[in-house]
Amino acid sequence: MKKAYLPLMAVCMGLAFVALVTVKAQAASIKLTYSNFFPAAHIQSQLVDSWCREVETRTKGRVNIKHYPGQTLTKAGECYEGVVKGRSDLGLSVLSYTQDRFPVMGTVDLPLGYTSGKVATAVANELYRKFRPKELSDSKVMYLHAHGPALVNTRGKAVRRLEDMKGLRFRTTGAAALIVKALGGIPVSVPMPECYQLIKSGKANGSTHPAESHKGWKLAEVENYVTAAYCISYTTTFFVIINKDKWNALPQDIKVIIEQINNEWLLQHGEAWDTSDTEGMQFFQAHGGQLIGLESSEAARWKMAVASIIDDYMTSLNERGLNGRDIVDFTIKTLNSMQ
C-alpha cells in the first residue's frame, strides 16, 4: 500500500511546489497602472491594451499593467501631471491639454499641411529625438504619436469661404485655437471628451479635428459638414509616458524589452490614425454628412490667413530662450522630407 501512495505523494508535492513558485512569482511581479483618456472602444485604447499585453508576454509575466481608459483614473488634462506625481504609473493624453507647458513639442501642432497620421507621428518623434526638450524631463517618454490632418467640422452651417468662419465657435485646443482665431472663428478650449455634448447643446458650432473623430468620438451624430482645408491642416501630439522613478526602478533587461515594444507600437499608432481617418469619413458620409472642398484660390486665402501663426510661434520660442528658428525649420524640413 505504501508503494502505491508514493507516486501520488510525489505528484502532490510537485503540484504544491509549482503552486508555491507561481504565487511567489505573482507576488514578485511588477504591477503598473496606465491612465488613458480615449474611450475603451477607441482604436487608440485598443492599441494601449495590446501594448500592455505585449509587455506582459515578452517579460514572461514579470510586468503586469492595469489599463484605465476613458478618464477613469485621471482626466485628460490632468494625465501628464498625474504620472509625474504618481497618481498613475503610465499615461496617454494630449500635450496641448496642458497649455504652454510644452513649447518645443507644440511646434508639431502648427498648421503645416499634414497629410497623414503616420507622417505626423514620425515628425513628432524626430523632433523629440533631435532636441530632447527640457519640458519633458520630469517624465520618461515612451513614445509620441499624432493624428492625421485636422479639418474644419460644423453643425448646421456649411463653411465654403473664409467669411463663413466669422463668429462661429469651435471646440479646439493648443495651436488649433490660434488657427481658428486667425480664420475668424472663436476658439472654445476644452478637451475632446467634452466635444460631443458641447456641439449638441449649441455651445459650439463645430470643432477642428481629424476625420477619425466622427466615428471614434461619434461626432458624425452632431456635425453635418467637413471643410477639407488640407492646405492648413494641423495635427495634435499625444504622449505616452511613465513615471521616472518607476522607470528607473525597472531591471535593465525589462527596460530594453519595453523600448523595443515602444518602437514597434509608435508605428502602429500612426498607421491606426490613418486607417481610422478613412473609416471615420465613411461613417460621417453614411450619416448624411457633406464633404466640402476648397478651390485653389480659396485655399490660398486660408493659407495666407494663418501664415503669421508660424512666425509668431517662432518668436514666442525665442522669448523663452529657445532657438525658435532651428526648432521650426527642423519641423518643417522633416515634414517636407516625408510627404
Task: Kindly give the residue locations of the regions a language model identified.
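N-terminal secretory/targeting leader peptides
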Residues: 26-119, 134-339
